[in-house]
């Protein structure tokens, strides 16, 4: 039993990451960013984790937050979207001294009423650099703002406005110090983890924090489910920081390919049989 738990622990451990290689890769990525024509202030660093199979459990693919050691957001115009009682939450924002950060509070009914056209939704999107969403209505945001948010890769942060253990102010502070994490429906998962303006040490700490959170909370089988891990910017090539054993990876990809194969339809089976019988006659 002890061996099993030790194996599980190893599957979640960061010991597999070569820290010296990671430091070297971070330096290489930052050098690439500085040599490009783009302003360094606008470049962001992402961690990309490729798994052998999609993470099937739906609860693990819900939007979540990862608290980072080094802040990556500087927000001055946040919008808070709540289920209802817009004025109540507007008053709460002012009472807790959040009105310098949260400049607009919208209820879902108000959002539906006031922002109907694509143009109106784009104006709302472009007026704010962060969207905080009541976790009770987070599932409605893709329906109401989907394509408009997707165009600019806007990812709303879930927040529990009914939380009694933690004030709204503290929750907002945690959001500002966090990154957005949502596993994709496929096998490639990309998470923002740093800024090009941060130091190598800050990026290292943020990257390892995100990776540890993924292994512990979102990828049940840990390293055994991961094909490779890399870091990148939005436009750069992925720079690998860990790759699974080549033979094992090839074997697992083969298994996944077989599992994902679509069963043949009856018409396709009949056509296949006709083809086989035709070949047999020809050979005679």
Swiss-Prot record:
Protein name: Putative ribosome biogenesis protein C306.07c
Subunit structure: Component of the 90S pre-ribosomes.
Family the entry assigns: Belongs to the universal ribosomal protein uL1 family. Highly divergent.
Record's keyword terms, sorted: Nucleus, Ribosome biogenesis, rRNA processing
Record InterPro entries: Ribosomal_uL1-like (IPR023674), Ribosomal_uL1/biogenesis (IPR028364), Ribosomal_uL1_3-a/b-sand (IPR016095)
Species this protein is from: Schizosaccharomyces pombe (strain 972 / ATCC 24843)
Keyword Glycoprotein: no
GO cellular component: nucleolus; nucleus
Predominant location: nucleus
Subcellular location: Nucleus, Nucleolus
Function per UniProt: Involved in rRNA-processing and ribosome biosynthesis.
């Amino acid at each position: 039993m002890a061996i099993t738990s030790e194996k599980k622990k190893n599957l979640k451990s960061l010991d597999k990451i070569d820290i010296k290689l990671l430091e070297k890769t971070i330096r290489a990525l930052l050098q690439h960013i500085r040599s490009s024509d783009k302003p360094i202030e606008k470049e962001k660093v992402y961690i990309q984790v490729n798994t052998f199979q999609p993470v099937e459990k739906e609860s693990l693919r819900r939007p979540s937050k990862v608290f980072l050691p080094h802040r990556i957001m500087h927000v001055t115009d946040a919008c808070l979207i709540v289920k209802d009682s817009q004025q109540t939450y507007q008053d709460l924002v002012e009472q807790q001294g959040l009105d310098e950060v949260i400049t607009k509070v919208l209820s879902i009914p108000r959002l539906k009423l006031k922002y109907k056209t694509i143009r109106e939704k784009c104006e709302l999107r472009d007026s704010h650099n962060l969207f905080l969403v009541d976790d009770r209505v987070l599932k409605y945001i893709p329906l109401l703002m989907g394509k408009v948010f997707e165009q600019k890769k806007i990812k709303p942060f879930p927040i529990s406005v009914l939380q009694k253990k933690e004030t709204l102010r503290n929750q907002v502070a945690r959001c500002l110090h966090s990154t957005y994490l949502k596993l994709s429906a496929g096998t490639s998962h990309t998470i923002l983890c740093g800024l090009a303006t941060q130091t190598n040490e800050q990026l290292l700490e943020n990257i390892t924090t995100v990776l540890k959170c993924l292994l512990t909370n979102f990828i049940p089988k840990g390293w055994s489910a991961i094909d490779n891990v890399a870091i990148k910017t939005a436009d750069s090539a992925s720079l690998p920081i860990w790759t699974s054993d080549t033979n094992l990876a090839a074997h697992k990809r083969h298994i996944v390919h077989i599992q994902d194969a679509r069963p043949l339809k009856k018409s396709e089976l009949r056509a296949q049989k006709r083809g086989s019988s035709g070949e047999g006659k020809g050979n005679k």
